[in-house]
Amino acid sequence: MRRFVHLIAIAITGISLTACSHNSEQITEEEKPRNIIYGIDADGYQVDNYEVVKGDTWGGILDSYGITTQKVNRLDALTKEICPLRTIRIGHKYTTFTKRDTVDTARMKLDYLVYEQDVVNYVVFAFVGDTVAVRKDSKPV
């Protein structure tokens, strides 16, 4: 009988130690820091930085990523008060967030483009799904 009790005690101890080790792995995975750039979770995106050069236009830049004329027109209407598309400036930086297109895997799909108006202020253009959105924000000083 004593042997039986010892075997049960050992089994319970083994099970509880195994359960504790699984919990610690789950906690470690949950605590993994996210890569946030301009308020966007950059994990899963290819992030590229560019500088506006002479001759660049928003229409041309966005067209090179397959953004349709209709979406550019919607973007133009949304940005009139925030950052008119005509105000693109040579030397200013912009960042693209792209990932592989699920239908055409040879093409990169643009989800976000961030334009730095100056060293502090930036504008995020979002093209996720059929949605076109714009938000203005600033870096912490």
Task: List each language-model region with its residue ranges.
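Sec-dependent bacterial lipoprotein signal peptides
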Residues: 1-18
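Intrinsically disordered, low-complexity regulatory tails and linkers that flank structured modules
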Residues: 20-141
